[in-house]
Amino acid sequence: MIKLMDLLRIAGIYLNSYKIHCATGKEDPPLEAFFECRFKAWQEYQNQQNFRCDEIISLIHLQEDKWLFAGIYQVLGVKHRKEENKSWYEYGTKEMAGLDHLTGRIVVQFRKRFLAAYRGSVAATPPGEPRE
């Protein structure tokens, strides 16, 4: 079985500071948002400042330990929003190009062993390339 990070490297994608977003939800399910072409906007609305990273690897829960690869998004910025008794964070993101052949087509086997919906990491830069 091939690992997702290996598949991304084959596609020429090398990530620096990233978080894995394990998208779940019942009120407005992320899978519905994905198939209705509004997942990017769905993901950009957060109750906390969850995406303190350069890139987001988005996975949408399907069942048990199966997750749909929903793309990689570059984090462009964040704005804290307030309205009456409500507060949230609105992210600006840009979907990484060149992954159309994988997005929505790859099912990742991943056993989530943590409570938060986000898992952070810093990936190695490819040999011979400077880190930004």
Predicted feature locations:
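Contiguous surface segments at macromolecular interaction interfaces
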Residues: 1-11, 19-23, 65-70, 78-132
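Short conserved beta-strand and strand-loop elements enriched in small hydrophobics
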Residues: 54-64
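Short connector loops at helix/strand junctions that flank enzyme active sites
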Residues: 51-54, 68-70
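Compositionally biased, charged N-terminal/linker segments
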Residues: 1-53, 130-132
